[in-house]
Amino acid sequence: IDPVVLFKIVFIQALDGLKSMRQTCKKIKVDAEYRWFLGIPFGKDTPHFSTFSKNYERRFKDSDIFEEIFVEIVNQAIKYNLVDGTTFYTDSTHKKANANKNKYDDEIVTSIKERRKWLEEEINEERIKQGRKPFEYKDEIEEKHIKVSKTDKESGYYHRDNKEKGFMYLDHRTVDDKCNIIVDAYITKGNVHDSVPFIDRAEYIKHKFGFDIKKYGVDSGYLTLDIKKYFIENNIFGVFGYRRYGTPESRKEKNKYEYVKELDIYYEKETGEVLEYKGLIDKNGYKKYENTDKTKVVRRHIHEEWNEIFRENRLSKEGKELYQKRKEHVERSFADSKQNHGYRYAMYKGVKKNQHYTWLICAAQNMKNIAIKNDNVGKKPLALSSILYKFIKILKKIINLNRKIYS
């Protein structure tokens, strides 16, 4: 069967938000518009619902055609001037895996804890500067108890406060500020933290599309030292959601003191008592500031100024506007996918299959967005069938470049 027809069927499913390929093929049998689009006249049999899955296993599984389709649609959005390419919003959403949360095996996983070697070097430089012996950092082995699904072993057990627990996949999505075009959607297990793939995916969109990233709006889950360093080094105006550290008592205690950068001291606001840095810094990069009798201690990270920079960003007028738009863009994108494009549940097992399906869903969502935005700005309206027709031309071009899928 012609692969163009197969992908047409998949996009009919994605654009109409149909729950399954079986339901899609049933509608194709009786819908004149679908038959016209597929080039199948009445009286001729339509493809069986299992046709695409069989072709996927034999022809498309190991190809990169799904990503190429997604990238080509983003490039079409850039061509229509619907992508700004400077301001982005990133977040993740969970998709329920096709797995029973009560059927799992408990496993112990060992891994080497990831080290920040750049931070270790800076800490040791500070210790040498103070005439102290540098620390010897070693690899630490971590052991974790995890739940592994008996049904879908590649899914991850997701548990967060005020969220449903169970086996999930995470979609780490990035959208552009101008017209909410999805520029990246990366699938991981449900037990992967939001911040882990962020830097790699930011580099991906930068090099894939040639974007000059100037601003990023993210929630507090991305407030890590590595991401702050990435924003500083790349001159990106980053806005993080507010995050509370420590206990209310400890925060109240530290707020009693004011830091003087020129003298590198803390002083108590009420009494004027001074806390000085005496060259003590721990393995995590926290410097100790003490009074003369060592009864009062305040810790300050070696890169505390980064926290101050991003706090100023968050409280600035520009930062408040940027963070307000975050939920109007990336959260809206997730809601649209789940409500209108059948994205609420993972219909496939395994990270790879879900990634391929996600590329197609996001490509369909972008196609719909392109049609609506072109209509809204007063240009010649692009009907959905017109978008699909243009997509077929793109698809044929991609398939010709990917002859390996025919083997």
Where does each model-flagged region fall?
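Short amphipathic alpha-helical interface patches used for protein-protein assembly/oligomerization
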Residues: Y34-L38
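Short, aromatic/basic-rich helix-turn unit that serves as a nucleic-acid recognition element
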Residues: A14
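Basic, short loop/linker segments at the boundary and entry of helix-turn-helix/winged-helix-like folds
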Residues: I1-F11
